[in-house]
Every structure is written in structure tokens, then in C-alpha cells.
């Protein structure tokens, strides 16, 4: 079967109508989505282009209506009657004929003619939901309509014979498989049917009574008893669909030869890993390690639910009897329960009867939950079924009023992190084992080398010892020989001495006495010499110790002297620099004074931008003298300085406006400057000159003057708000934008100027400056918004103001919500305060809820670092009935 798209009435194909021929009443084992062909030509519609708007609510249920072409029976039976519906796809409208002269018009998100192709149906109905599922949101696509209007054809057609006839289930899985990675992501499916209020597993027929389990904390619904099959490719999925379809209950009725007797529910579970960077360990002790420190891995779990509802039927038309009658009752009861729940959600009823049917329990996340939901309602053209068609259309209209709160479900993938760390640990263990083995091999090699060296040394030592022994023995023998010869010689001399003993005895005794005296003298001399040497050594030791102490003292003194010299040199350099600066300042002040005295524009002042920055550091000098600008103002006169603002010389004009800006920083000078006409001159500079320096300093001076309430009123009266808005639109320099934003922020703090600020474009100018993105500019913008919101809140409390906030009127709420949790503390603090003040006015509550501000208020009441803001947020949420109702509806813990 094929369905072709229709754009602006152009026909590309046709749909084969459902056959109404009666056949056997047995359960069909073939695919029930086969619909016979032969459709008449589609009706022409106007070329207007007005669609059903979604009111800017991203979570609203999108509803499309699809018309089935006439089948053979209807072509014969209704040949003399016009179709009960007329489609206007360009306008996204449908006209329902109540009779020949009365029609009703309905708008839908999409209107699909009988010629619309399966591809177009998928792209406008299911593809946005599939893309959301790939991004981490839950999604639901559901088909609703009278039996025989093509729900199963639209949703579950396999397209074996004709690829173009593939239904939403097949095309959705193709996109999901194409948008995921088999390495990091996983896809699993469950295929169920709700038959006679019993949940049965189409993939495992023996599992015919599956229980519904609800998480008491989150309210999530799960079916732990269902079969989950992991999908690796498209062919695997097609085989599962064929298996499930053979187990689905179908029967032959008067309205449809293959009428579904159960609600088919295909659940596709997608788990995707969020890729994040990993940073290596930078510790010096682990410089050689292979560890990396991964951030906590995130896993997004999403679920796509495709629901092929059984068709509603009227018993007298379908001819159901016996068991088929009980089936029809069960189908109609579950569809009725679903309609009641949708009515309750659409009307914001405090009670939604979700537990009236297992179908509503399974679909609680699809209507009023966190899933992105698309509903396709299928209708037939026959006027005989005008009542069923009207009921189906009204069901779709009510479903369009349901708004869901979309939410991404993320969790930390500790299992993946554990596996990754285990792999790294295995690598480190293997590397450690390799290093340990290499170390052991090195130790063994060194031991072998040492043993070889020792053996070689022992061998050499033994050889040397043997040689030394031989040498000693030879020397010993020679010594013995010499001693023997000497002994013989002495014996001979002794014998000769005996003969000459008497003569030699006298000589020997006298010689002995002399030698003895000489020896005693030598011993005395030696002893005295030793004593002298001891004295000299002791004296030398004392002198050495004394010299060492003196050397240490000299070294210490030399170091102190060097430090003093270095310090003196630094001080002399600082004195030189200070003297040069003093001379330069004196020279510049004299130049300015002479220039002011003469008042001649030709004598240009050549000073640089550093003069105001030097003088702004201190208002009074150390010795109690006045600051240079105050002294200059007293000596020259404020009026002459203001006259120089209109000088033709650019340098004089720039330095004059800098002097005025520095004077305006002092509260005592602000009133004098305003009285002397300085404010008018500064506004003239903003209006007349495009020099960025002049505009920046002039805006800064105006910002200083805007701190005074009298000056604020004068700024507004002289068109300062419009002028500041124009400057903000033209300027690109962040510092200029910071000055302009600061001036407007100061004006926002005046209760009397609220309406004028809004009408003159001050708020829009403030919001326009966020394009810069500079933190200082954003901080001033946030401060202005906080001041404005505070004044509005005070005026509302006093009964002076009513109606929505002007900030919301100018579209400031999205930016406020976006930066409510900004990393910069000044921006975050001001935005949190602004949100609290906006929330105090009940008329702003609905816009704040739709804009996402409620979540930020809850966060502020719990996490804000400042106690006063935290308590203000908590008090505001507690006192607002609208916020309390929404918090209860969303189930927020507060």
C-alpha cells in the first residue's frame, strides 16, 4: 500500500481504501496493516497558509489528522453523498459537515489528506519526537481513531512489498539506529499488547500477565516482567515486529476485516553516552604513570513509546457478539478512561483519574508528564460514520491542550567508568609487571657481572700472592745468607779484639763517656724543642680560631653592607621616579591652568589619558592637601572647565571631560556641576561627537551624576534616556557600554522614572547591550534589571501600579532565566534578586512558569548563598497560590 504527500493541493499518490467485505471471524496470522487500494481523487483546497499555532509551548502535544480514502464499499454505498469532512491542508484546517448547510472548522498542527505519503506522515508526526529521543527526552507517538481508518497502516506497516509504504515504527527505528553508535550506545525494544485489561508480551506469548510497577519517588512506570531485546540492526527489528504481529489479537468485523482487538505498545529504550574530555594527572609523583583522571561519565536514558490503539466501535455497526462484544467493551472502556484523563489534564483539574485503566497508567508520562508527544488521529470520509468522526476530531482537539514538561534524564555511568578504570588498571599492572621483570633481569645481569669480576679479582689476587710468597722466600734466604756472612765476620773481629783489648779499652771508655754526655745534651735539646713546638702549635691554633671568627664577622658585615647598598640604590631609583612624576604632574597642571586662564583653543594641552587615572587613586594627598582636580577647580573655576567641553581642539575637549568626570565622582561636586550646566554639556557631547573616548568618559560622568535624585530627573527631562539608548546601540567598546549600562542602571533605581524609562526605550537598550558578552557590562545590565524589578514590586505593593511587569513586556524574562545561575557572582546575585521581586506580583506568575523561572526560584530558595535572597524566594513561593499549584502539579520537593 502507498500513501503520497499532498502540498498545496497537488496529488502525488493515493491510498487504498479498507475493504468492508465480510470474511471469517477468526484471528488473522498475517499483518493486519494491509489496506486495499483504489482511492478517488482528493478534494481541492485553498492555497491559504494559516496553521494551527503551538502557542510557543515546546511541550504541548502535537496533533495531526489523517483522512483515509474511500474503500470499495463506501464508494458504492455513499456514491450519492458527499464526504463528511473537507480538508484544507494549506491552512491546517478541517471542516466537518454537520448537514448540507452547516459546517464546523477545526485547526490542527498538521492536516494530511488521503494522498499524503507514509514518508510525509512520518516527517511531520514522528520525526521530531524521534530526534528528541536521540537528544535524551522521552517521546510518544500514538494513533487514535475509529476502527478501520488506517491506524495500524500508519504506524505498523512493514513495507515488505513496497518500501515507500513503511510505517512509523520501521522509519523511527531506522533513524534511531542511524543516530546512535553501536560501540557506545544501546537500543532495546519491548513489544506488548493490552488485551482485556491484561498486559501481554507479544515477543513471549507465555508471559501473559505483566504487572505495572510505579516508582514511589519519581512516579516513573516500568514493566520489569516484559521481554527486552537488544537491537543491533534493522533486519533484527523487522523480525521482532513480524513475530509480535503474529501474536496480536485481531478479528473480522463488519467495519474491518482485520480489526485490532488490543492496544499494541512498542517501547524503544535508548541509552546514549555523553562524551566528555579526560584530563591527565599532573602530579609530579605520577609523571610516569599512565593514569588519566576522567570526569564522571554521563548516560542519557530515553524511551520512545509507539502506541497503536485499538479502534473505537459501536456494537450495532460492527456486529460484535459474544466474546468479541466483551473485547469491544474493554476497548471502549480503556479509550473512555484515556479521554477522561486528557480532559482533566487539559482543564487543569486537581485530580486526573490515571488509575481507571492500565492504558492510562502506561501513558501517564505521555500526557501531562515529561515526554514529547505526537498524536495522529485517523478518520474516514463516509457520512455514515459522522458521529465517530466527530468524536475522534474532538478527542484530538482536547489533546492539543495538554502541555508536558520536557525533561532529559541523565545519570552517572559508574559502570562504564568502572570498566574504563579496570582497563587502565590492567594496563598499569601489565606495565608494572614488565618493569618488574626488566628490573629483575637487570639485577641478575649485574649480579653475574659482579660474580665474574670477583672471580677474576680472586684469581689475580691468588697469582699475585703466590708471586709475593716466592719473592719473600728469596729475600729471606738472601737475608739469612748475609747474616751468616756477617756473623762469621764478627766472630773474626772479636778474636782480633781480644788480642788488642787492653790498648783499646781506655779509648773505648772515654769515647763512651763522651758519647753518653752528648746523648744527654741531645735529649735535653730535643725535649726543649718539643716544648717550644707545642707552644707554637697552641698559639697557632688560637690564632687560627680567632682568624676564622674574624673572617665570619667580616663576611657578615660585607653582606649587610651589600644589602644596604642595594636598598639604597632601590630607594634612590624610586625617589628619582617620584621626582620625575612630580615634575610631570606639576608641568601638566601648569599647562592646564594656563590653558584655562587664556581660554584660547589654539594652545592645545598635550597630556595623556594617564592624568585622570593618576589623580583618581587618592582624593587627598598624604600631607592633607586637596586632590589636584579639586585644587584645579578652585583655582580655575568650574565654569571655565565646562566651557572647554565645547572647545574645537580635540585634546582640550577630551581632557576637560575627564576633569568633569573626576569631579562628578565626588558627591559634593555633583550639584555644582548640574547647576553650572555641566549635565547639558555632557549630553551635548554624547549627541554631537562620535569619538569613542569622549563618549565613554561623558557616559561615565553622566553615570556618576545619575546617582543623585535631582540629577536623575534632569537627565530624563533633557532626553537623556533616549540619548543613552542611541549611544548603547552605536557603541562597540565594552567600557563605553559599561558606562552607559551603569547610567541606565542608576536611573532604574528611581520609582518615579519607571514609565519614562520603559517608554523611552531604556529597558530595551539595557537588554540590547548583552550582545557584548563582557562580564562587566552584563553585571551592570543585571543591576539595572534588579533595580527596576525592585521599584516595580514596591509600586505594586503600594497600589500605584497594576498589570504585568514592564520587564516581561520588553522580553527580558528569557535572558533573566538564562543567567539566573551565571558563574559570575555579581550577575547571579542581581538576577536572583530580580526574579524574587518579579515573582512577588501574582500577575507575572503564569509567564514566569511558562518561561522556566519557577525552577530557578525553587533553586534560589534552596541553594542561594545569601540568606536574605534565599528566604525572600521561599516566602514568595509559599505565598503565591499559582506557584504552589504548579509545584504540586510537577511534584517538586519544596
UniProtKB/Swiss-Prot annotation:
Database matches in InterPro entries: ARM-like, ARM-type_fold, Armadillo, KIF11-like, Kinesin_motor_CS, Kinesin_motor_dom, Kinesin_motor_dom_sf, P-loop_NTPase
Which stretches are annotated as coiled coil? Answer: 423-588
Q: Where does ATP bind?
A: 145-152
Q: Where expressed (tissue)?
A: Expressed in the basal regions and petioles of immature leaves and in the root elongation zone.
Q: Where are the transmembrane segments?
A: none
Q: Read off the PROSITE patterns from this record.
A: ARM_REPEAT (PS50176), KINESIN_MOTOR_1 (PS00411), KINESIN_MOTOR_2 (PS50067)
Gene Ontology BP annotations:
microtubule-based movement
**Primary localisation category:** cytoplasm
Q: Which CDD domains match?
A: KISc (cd00106)
Q: Which GO terms describe its cellular component?
A: cytoplasm; microtubule
Assembly, in brief, is: Interacts (via C-terminus) with NEK5.
Q: Which family does it belong to?
A: Belongs to the TRAFAC class myosin-kinesin ATPase superfamily. Kinesin family. Ungrouped subfamily.
Question: PANTHER family per the record?
Answer: KINESIN-LIKE PROTEIN, KINESIN-LIKE PROTEIN KIF11
Instruction: Return the protein name.
Output: Kinesin-like protein KIN-UB
Q: What is the source species?
A: Arabidopsis thaliana
Amino acid at each position: 500500500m502507498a500513501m503520497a504527500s499532498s502540498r498545496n493541493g497537488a496529488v502525488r499518490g493515493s491510498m487504498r481504501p479498507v475493504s468492508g467485505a465480510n470474511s471469517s471471524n477468526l484471528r488473522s496470522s498475517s499483518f493486519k496493516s494491509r489496506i486495499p487500494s483504489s482511492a478517488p481523487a482528493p478534494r481541492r483546497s485553498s492555497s491559504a497558509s494559516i496553521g494551527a499555532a503551538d502557542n510557543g509551548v515546546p511541550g504541548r502535544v502535537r496533533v495531526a489528522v489523517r483522512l483515509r480514502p474511500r474503500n470499495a464499499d463506501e464508494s458504492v454505498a455513499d456514491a450519492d453523498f458527499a464526504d463528511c469532512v473537507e480538508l484544507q491542508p494549506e491552512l491546517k484546517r478541517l471542516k466537518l459537515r454537520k448537514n448540507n448547510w452547516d459546517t464546523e472548522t477545526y485547526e490542527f498542527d498538521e492536516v494530511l489528506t488521503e494522498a499524503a505519503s507514509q514518508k510525509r506522515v512520518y516527517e511531520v508526526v514522528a520525526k521530531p519526537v524521534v530526534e528528541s529521543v536521540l537528544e535524551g527526552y522521552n517521546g510518544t507517538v500514538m494513533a487514535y481513531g475509529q476502527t478501520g481508518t488506517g491506524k495500524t497502516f500508519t504506524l505498523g506497516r512493514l513495507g515488505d512489498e513496497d518500501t515507500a509504504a513503511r510505517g512509523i515504527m520501521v522509519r523511527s527505528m531506522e533513524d534511531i539506529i542511524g543516530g546512535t553508535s553501536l560501540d557506545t550506545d544501546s537500543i532495546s525494544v519491548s513489544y506488548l499488547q493490552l488485551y482485556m485489561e491484561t498486559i501481554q508480551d507479544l515477543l513471549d506469548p507465555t508471559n501473559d500477565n505483566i504487572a505495572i510497577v510505579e516508582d514511589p519517588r519519581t512516579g516513573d512506570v516500568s514493566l520489569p516482567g516484559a521481554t527486552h531485546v537488544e537491537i543491533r540492526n534493522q533486519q533484527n527489528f523487522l523480525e521482532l515486529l513480524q513475530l509480535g504481529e503474529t501474536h496480536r489479537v485481531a478479528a473480522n468485523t463488519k467495519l474491518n476485516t482485520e480489526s485490532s482487538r488490543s492496544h499494541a505498545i512498542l517501547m524503544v529504550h535508548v541509552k546514549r553516552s555523553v562524551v566528555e574530555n579526560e584530563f591527565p594527572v599532573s602530579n609530579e609523583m605520577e609523571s610516569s604513570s599512565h593514569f588519566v583522571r576522567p570526569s564522571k561519565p554521563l548516560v542519557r536514558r530515553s524511551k520512545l513509546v509507539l502506541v497503536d490503539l485499538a479502534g473505537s466501535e459501536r456494537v450495532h455497526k460492527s456486529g460484535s457478539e459474544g466474546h468479541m462484544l466483551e473485547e469491544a467493551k474493554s476497548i471502549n472502556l480503556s479509550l473512555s478512561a484515556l479521554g477522561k484523563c486528557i480532559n482533566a489534564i487539559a482543564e487543569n483539574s486537581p485530580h486526573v483519574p490515571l488509575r481507571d485503566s492500565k492504558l492510562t497508567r502506561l501513558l501517564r508520562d505521555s500526557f501531562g508528564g515529561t515526554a514529547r508527544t505526537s498524536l495522529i488521529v485517523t478518520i474516514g470520509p463516509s457520512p455514515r460514520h459522522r458521529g465517530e468522526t466527530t468524536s475522534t476530531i474532538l478527542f484530538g482537539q482536547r489533546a492539543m491542550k495538554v502541555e508536558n514538561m520536557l525533561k532529559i534524564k541523565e545519570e552517572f555511568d559508574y559502570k562504564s567508568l568502572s570498566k574504563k578504570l579496570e582497563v587502565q588498571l590492567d594496563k598499569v599492572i601489565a606495565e608494572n609487571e614488565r618493569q618488574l621483570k626488566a628490573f629483575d633481569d637487570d639485577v641478575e645481569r649485574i649480579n653475574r657481572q659482579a660474580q665474574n669480576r670477583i672471580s677474576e679479582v680472586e684469581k689475580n689476587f691468588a697469582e699475585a700472592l703466590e708471586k709475593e710468597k716466592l719473592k719473600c722466600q728469596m729475600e729471606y734466604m738472601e737475608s739469612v745468607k748475609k747474616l751468616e756472612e756477617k756473623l762469621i765476620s764478627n766472630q773474626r773481629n772479636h778474636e782480633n779484639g781480644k788480642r788488642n783489648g787492653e790498648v783499646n779499652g781506655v779509648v773505648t771508655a772515654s769515647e763512651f763517656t763522651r758519647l753518653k754526655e752528648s746523648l744527654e745534651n741531645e735529649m735535653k735539646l730535643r725535649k726543649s724543642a718539643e716544648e717550644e713546638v707545642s707552644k707554637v702549635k697552641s698559639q697557632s691554633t688560637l690564632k687560627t680560631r680567632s682568624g676564622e671568627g674574624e673572617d665570619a664577622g667580616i663576611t657578615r658585615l660585607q653582606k649587610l653592607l651589600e644589602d644596604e647598598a642595594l636598598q639604597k640604590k632601590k630607594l634612590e631609583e624610586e625617589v628619582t621616579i617620584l621626582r620625575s612624576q612630580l615634575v610631570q604632574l606639576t608641568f601638566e597642571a601648569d599647562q592646564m591652568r594656563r590653558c584655562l586662564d587664556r581660554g584660547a583653543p589654539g594652545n592645545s594641552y598635550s597630556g595623556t589619558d594617564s592624568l585622570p587615572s593618576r589623580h583618581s587613586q587618592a582624593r587627598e594627598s598624604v600631607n592633607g592637601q586637596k586632590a589636584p582636580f579639586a585644587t584645579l577647580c578652585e583655582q580655575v573655576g568650574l565654569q571655565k572647565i565646562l566651557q572647554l567641553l565645547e572647545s574645537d581642539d580635540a585634546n582640550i575637549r577630551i581632557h576637560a571631560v575627564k576633569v568633569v568626570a573626576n569631579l562628578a565622582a565626588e558627591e559634593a561636586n555633583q550639584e555644582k556641576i548640574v547647576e553650572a550646566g555641566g549635565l547639558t554639556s555632557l549630553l551635548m557631547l554624547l549627541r554631537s561627537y562620535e569619538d569613542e573616548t569622549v563618549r565613554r568618559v561623558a557616559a561615565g560622568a553622566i553615570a556618576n551624576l545619575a546617582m543623585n535624585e535631582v540629577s536623575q530627573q534632569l537627565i530624563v527631562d533633557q532626553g537623556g534616556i533616549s540619548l543613552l539608548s542611541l549611544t548603547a546601540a552605536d557603541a562597540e567598546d565594552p567600557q563605553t557600554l559599561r558606562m552607559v549600562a551603569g547610567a541606565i542602571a542608576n536611573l532604574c533605581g528611581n520609582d518615579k522614572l519607571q514609565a519614562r524609562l520603559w517608554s523611552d526605550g531604556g529597558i530595551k537598550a539595557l537588554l540590547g547591550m548583552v550582545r557584548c558578552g563582557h562580564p562587566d557590562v552584563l553585571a551592570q545590565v543585571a543591576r539595572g534589571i534588579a533595580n527596576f524589578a525592585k521599584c516595580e514590586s514596591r509600586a505594586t505593593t503600594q497600589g500605584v501600579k497594576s498589570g504585568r511587569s514592564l520587564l516581561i513586556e520588553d522580553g527580558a524574562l528569557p535572558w533573566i532565566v538564562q543567567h539566573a545561575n551565571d558563574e559570575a557572582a555579581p550577575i547571579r546575585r542581581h538576577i536572583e534578586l530580580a526574579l524574587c521581586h518579579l515573582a512577588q506580583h501574582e500577575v507575572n506568575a503564569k509567564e514566569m512558569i511558562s518561561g522556566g523561572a519557577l525552577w530557578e526560584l525553587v533553586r534560589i530558595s534552596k541553594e542561594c548563598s545569601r540568606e536574605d535572597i534565599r528566604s525572600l524566594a521561599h516566602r514568595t513561593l509559599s505565598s503565591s497560590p499559582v506557584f504552589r499549584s504548579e509545584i504540586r502539579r510537577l511534584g517538586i520537593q519544596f
